[in-house]
Every structure is written in C-alpha cells, then in structure tokens.
Amino acid sequence: YQEDNFSRYYAASIVRGREHDPFVAKGGSAEETRDTKKMEDKASKLKDFTVAEARPLPVIVMADVSGSMTVDGKIEALNLALKDMVAGFAAESRLRAEIQVGLITFGGERARVHLPLAPAHKISEVSPLRADGRTPMGAAFEEARKLIEDKDMIPSRAYRPVLVLVSDGLPTDDWEQPLDGLCKSERGQKATRFAMAIGADADVEMLRRFANDPESPVFKAHEARDIHRFFRAVTMSVTSRSRSTAPNSSAPLVLADIPEDDDLDLDF
C-alpha cells in the first residue's frame, strides 16, 4: 500500500512538471528542452565575445610642393618620409582603431587631393610628390576642412583626426580665413594638429596658429634628416593612440626617441 501510494505520487509529480514546461506542452521531451536551453546559452555567450569593428583614425597630411621644395633634397626627403609613415601605419594592429591616411598637396596654382583618404593597410603605393610653382596654402586648408567635415568619408564613429601641416615658405594666397575655418570647424577644433617648418624661410608664426598641442610646438627642420625624424615622431604618436584604450586622447610628438639618419644630412 505504501509503495503503491508513493508510485502514484511520483507519477503525478512528473506529470505536473511536464505540464509547466512550455516545450514539453508543445510535444517536446524534457531532454530536448534541456538541449535547446544549452544551445541558447552558448549562443548568448558567443554574442558577448563578438569583436567590435575597428573605428577609423584619420591622418591627413597637407604637404607643401611649391618650387622651393626642389632645393636641397627637401622633396626627396618628404617622399621617403611619407612612404615610411604609411608603411608603419599599415603594419599596426586594427583591433581597436584603423589608421587611415589622406594626402593634400599645395603647389603651383592650386591644392589637390594627392592621396584620397583610405585605410593605411590598403594603400599599395604613395606616388612621388613633384614640386613646382607657388604656395597656395589657403586652398589646402579649405580642402582639409571639406574632407574632415564629410560624414561619408569620415563617419561619426571615427576617432578624432590628426592633421599634419608641412611647409618651407610663405602662403601665396588668402589663407587666414581658410585657416580659421579649418581650426574652428566642428572636427578641426577637436583634431590633433602638428606642424613642421622646413628651412629658414618658413612662416613659423602662421604654423603656430595651426598647431594646437602645447606639448608639440612647431617642429623646425634644418636639414633633410629632420623631415624624416618628424614623420617618424608623427608615426609613433598616432600608433600610440591606436593601441591606447582611449584613442581619442592625443599623444605628443617625442623626437628625442627618434634616431638621426646619417644618409640624410643636407642642410637647408
């Protein structure tokens, strides 16, 4: 009698448990229910480990290619420095930030986009710069402003851009209003802005108005090797940001850590 009552009680408990199992109520077994829940738990955990897409970190260089850059190997040193910088960026990990590079040149009568903004690891070659003519720097500022404010080229999720200005002379066009327009634009005022004055004829005061990092004042290049050292420092600053847990924080130029190149020893 006791055994019979226990059997009936146990059977009733099982039935009640099955009635409250939504999967079993629809015709599935308890074992199938457990397997389904395990699969759902695994899928949920996989979602937690999904790797986020790297955010763009734009680097835009404005390079002087006026006629004076042909003197003393300046343009050759600049070409080599840009090539090495892009290669350095391309070798970086893209887990958090994807470094992108664009190049605007100004020389002759106009400024133009020499290298459209693109991920560094997808840039197969930077065609050599050729120097000639005047120094339309104001036009370069306007090109840079249009580029950094273009939400199709640089999406809202991008990290703050880096702007680099390199010149060996005085602007030959109207430049003050375009410079203010660039530096006061929504993204321009948040950007990290580095500047290099090449030789004794560069407009250092104008370059100071462009540069905005108190820890990285206008760098003065007195010889060809200095151009290379400056761009190595830019490379280190940007890659440091890309590896950081906070890539929107600027990293100053540290030229003390950059070795001098004995094969680039032309004085300007």
What are the roles of these predicted feature ranges?
Residues 52-114, 122-159, 162-166, 173-174, 192-205, ...:
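Von Willebrand factor
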Residues 93-94, 183-191:
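Arginine/glycine-rich "motif VI" loop of SF2 helicases in the C-terminal RecA-like domain
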Residues 57, 189-192, 213-216:
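Short glycine-/polar-rich loops that comprise or flank the Walker A/P-loop
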Residues 17, 23-60, 65-76, 149-156:
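Acidic, polar low-complexity linker/tail segments
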Residues 200-249:
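Von Willebrand factor A/integrin I-like adhesion domains
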Residues 199, 224, 246-268:
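Extended acidic, low-complexity intrinsically disordered regions
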Residues 97-127, 204-212:
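Short beta-strand-loop
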